[in-house]
Design a protein with these regions (language model features):
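Extended, low-polarity segments enriched in aliphatic/aromatic residues
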Residues: 2-61, 71-80, 85-374
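Terminal amphipathic helices with adjacent charged low-complexity linkers/tails
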Residues: 66-67
Length: 374
């Protein structure tokens, strides 16, 4: 496969030019206007942020993309699917309330918001996964598959289970219905090392399923409630929470890549990622820790695999922020440095598996040429 082209612009803005201007220029340079959108539905997939989280992308960025689509005669809508775990986005009504409270509405974004898998998270389409090894079919939100054109607008940041969240996670996990998310997470559930557990209760606070209680000051998981989402693993600073299935995170990564392929296959797709507010964990949390790396810039490409690889490469070259989860880990005496910012922030991850699987099944390539837009 030939190298893909990824376009990049930084966040430096001379007087009279805004970040929104630069985002529009980036998208145009990357070829968004080459897509025939006239009279067609355009799904713009993004994350509206959990209530309490402040790291998610601002709605202003979404409006730039929506306006570009409308200029080309397209009919855009913002979309995301409901979450597997309880929170403010577990059904469409609460999800829409959450989006509105976080600033996403028709005025701020210039388009409608549609929750992809319906009121209860059960409005799904079973989509074949071409060349799938782990998933022969994927359960994708119905509204997302109804669109003629698919665009992902992703906040690139760290993630406690997948290493980072970029385009492939935004597409693969994000477009899965609640049952689709369960299928991806079904490779294993966490366990507690009682000898290491300090009873700090941080894992229980992060659990979205109310599945963790404490007995004799030690965490105990109720597996009837546990969804296997892995948030508790990222929450523990002492490695007391772990997945006994050593390959579970890698299996999740590979399934996620196959779900992304199911979403994109057979229709025009375009991808944008903003590498800013690089928190160590997912925007699904009701909080966001300090950024682990400085803001880097904006990327766009027709290839989501190359896009994620370019974002990851840029992050790996960046200097860690001292007062952050990553900086604190690197400063710990005896810390085993992985020379990988994502793995040093969240050691129990295998982020390269997602890109490897996505490339293997033909979604894109990890080889890219970076073109810089001033």
């Amino acid at each position: 496969m030939e190298k893909s082209t990824v376009y990049f612009t930084d966040f430096r803005c001379p007087v009279g030019t805004s970040q929104l201007d630069k985002l529009k220029k980036l998208c145009v340079a990357a070829g968004i206007k080459d897509i025939d959108m006239d009279g067609k539905f355009v799904a713009i997939k993004m994350h509206f942020g959990e209530l309490g989280n402040m790291a998610f992308l601002r709605p202003n960025y979404a409006k730039v993309v929506a306006d570009l689509c409308k200029e080309q005669g397209g009919m855009p809508f913002l979309t995301d699917c409901n979450t597997l775990y309880p929170g403010s986005r577990k059904n469409a009504l609460e999800h829409l309330d959450c989006a509105n409270l976080n600033g996403f509405n028709t005025i701020t974004t210039g388009c409608q918001i549609i929750i992809g898998d319906g009121v209860r998270g059960t409005d799904e389409v079973e989509v074949p996964v071409v060349n799938g090894e782990y998933c022969k079919t994927a359960l994708i939100g119905h509204a997302i598959m109804d669109a003629d054109i698919f665009i992902s607008l992703s906040h690139f940041k760290g993630h406690e289970t997948t290493g980072f969240g970029g385009a492939l996670k935004n597409i693969g996990m994000g477009c899965g219905s609640r049952a689709g998310k369960m299928q991806q997470h079904a490779s294993g559930k966490p366990a507690i090392n009682e000898e290491v557990c300090r009873g700090c209760r941080r894992c229980a606070k992060e659990c979205g399923s109310d599945a963790i209680t404490y007995v004799n000051k030690k965490a105990v998981i109720d597996y009837d409630k546990c969804k296997g989402c892995g948030r508790c693993i990222g929450a523990c600073s002492y490695d007391a929470v772990y997945n006994p299935n050593s390959s579970a995170n890698e299996l999740l990564d590979r399934k996620m890549a196959e779900y992304a392929q199911a979403v994109c296959h057979g229709r025009p797709h375009f991808h944008i990622a903003l590498v800013q507010d690089i928190s160590p964990n997912c925007d699904c949390h009701g909080e966001n820790d300090a950024p682990i790396l400085p803001d880097i810039g904006m990327f766009a490409s027709f290839d989501p695999v190359a896009l994620d690889q370019a974002c990851a490469d840029a992050c790996l070259k960046a200097t860690p922020i001292e007062n952050s989860q990553l900086g604190e880990h690197l400063a710990e005496p005896g810390w085993h440095c992985h020379h990988d910012h994502f793995k040093d922030s969240n050691p129990n991850i295998e982020w390269k598996a997602t890109l490897d699987q996505a490339e293997k099944i033909g979604l894109g390539t990890r080889e890219y040429e970076l073109k810089i837009i001033k």
